[in-house]
Amino acid sequence: MRKIIINGGKALSGEVAVSGAKNSVVALIPAIILADDIVILDGVPAISDVDSLIEIMELMGATVNYHGDTLEIDPRGVQDIPMPYGKINSLRASYYFYGSLLGRFGQAVVGLPGGCDLGPRPIDLHLKAFEAMGVEVSYEGENMNLSTNGQKIHGAHIYMDTVSVGATINTMVAATKAQGKTVIENAAREPEIIDVATLLNNMGAHIRGAGTDIITIQGVQKLHGTRHQVIPDRIEAGTYIALAAAIGKGVKITNVLYEHLESFIAKLEEMGVRMTVEEDAIFVEKQESLKAITIKTSPYPGFATDLQQPLTPLLLKADGRGTIIDTIYEKRINHVPELMRMGADISVIGGQIVYQGPSRLTGAQVKATDLRAGAALVTAGLMAEGKTEITNIEFILRGYASIIAKLTALGADIQLIED
């Protein structure tokens, strides 16, 4: 069993570069199945989710070359075969294969997706959209069968009952090679959706409106190869910004797009965090007094649900009482009992996280229960006095590229060990 060991209390300084966006690349890779030639992605993060996706692509017949942060995929050998259940079950973003396989073959046999357990986030919205496009859905054991019965998937007018990044991307991908026009209303607006649309348009797709709540896709017959730069990971950027404010004495975070983090930065400024926004970087100063605030997550451009857990340790450093309300994933509270083990004055009351600061954290044995909870525990361990041991770290490695090396370069006493 692998663990992360942190000896906390050391102030961090220096520069850290943000990697390519996890939430983009897990959709970009499956979308490449639609291409009729080689596609190259630059800025691909070195995370285990990418490794899993590459393995799935190779099992399906794609030729893959991965060097540094450049990923080259030739999808021409991809075959219409049942997808490997084990990998699918461990990877929530595996549902992005639904749209690309339907777009290319008109059918797919897939296992139900896994990933972090954050409460209800069903794929019903995806399936409702597919059914509107002529897809029949059936189940056999742990597999789901999607089929157009030999017909070409067709365009449709689709209204998303709930704003959903995954369903928006999946529908957009499926519609790219559909017959006719597809309109998605109440679409999610996240930057990652724009990134996927940019890749597809560079391949020859006709997608308009990505980043707004109405997306229009005119289906095309062929998509050529291209080269695409993955956008920076706004969640990783926010994690390092919060970490720098919590335990830094001058940290510069580079490869940052400020416009993707405006709501997050606004809440930090409300706390009193001192930082300087540069063209593609943010410099976070050593902090003095901070004020407790209330956080309420909402769809983009609101405060990202993926950032409420990584921000929590910094909130524990603030003076006063505050609350965290996650309107997206109600079960995103599993980091709370782990922080309590470290001495945090924090609890869950009526579905809301309530904290009282400042809390003095001490090292403890804790468990990462999901990706962003794991990030919160890393920051808390760096803040704490003494030794912190984090288990279940596979969640952390799913989404944070080279996290041990990046933090070590900032002066952290952190290591990954095999037990």
Curated annotation (Swiss-Prot):
Pathway note: Cell wall biogenesis; peptidoglycan biosynthesis
Q: Where does phosphoenolpyruvate bind?
A: K22, N23
Q: Which GO terms describe its cellular component?
A: cytoplasm
Q: Name one GO biological process term.
A: regulation of cell shape
Report TM segments: none
The listed locations are: Cytoplasm
Q: What does this protein do?
A: Cell wall formation. Adds enolpyruvyl to UDP-N-acetylglucosamine.
Family (UniProt): Belongs to the EPSP synthase family. MurA subfamily.
Q: What protein is this chain from?
A: UDP-N-acetylglucosamine 1-carboxyvinyltransferase 2
Which source organism does the UniProt entry give? Answer: Streptococcus pyogenes serotype M3 (strain ATCC BAA-595 / MGAS315)
What is this protein's gene name? murA2
